[in-house]
Amino acid sequence: MNPTPRVAIRPFVATDSAQVQTLVSDARVAQVAGNIPYPYPAGGAKTWIASHGAQHRAGTAIIRAIVSLEDGQCIRAISIDQMSRGLNSSGNLGYWVGVPYWNKGFCKEAGQLMLELAAKEYAMGRLVAAHRMDNPASGRVLQKLGFNELEPQMMTNLSGQYLFRCYEKIL
């Protein structure tokens, strides 16, 4: 995928683990992401990055680092998981962003790259996404990416049970 003027997406590499460990060790990231434990375990980023290859080979997930072209830093993760293939191919879009990079538009740019990757390289026809009701910034990103809002649903994540806003996009 061609980068935007500010960000590129690429597979994570082992050298990203220190930056990822720092970013996800912030309680605010764990709170809004919902699937990141807090406190984040020592060495957790290294283990998480090492798991990506098996998920990709199994066809269950596409996980990418979002890199700032301004400073070369890994600033976030974006993924499509719960992938299904075939006639009704679909997946679940998820992302988290390091706190220093919040409210700067990086999510929308990286999301556009991931949607292009899903449609062109993986022939996906539909993506779904969700965010906790107390995280409206994620909803704004999804709306800017052209996702349509569905009925809210109660869901459980690592932080507990919450009401989530749900979305879908036909690619």
Regions found by a protein language model. Give the residues of each.
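Short loop/turn motifs at secondary-structure junctions and domain boundaries
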Residues: 55-59
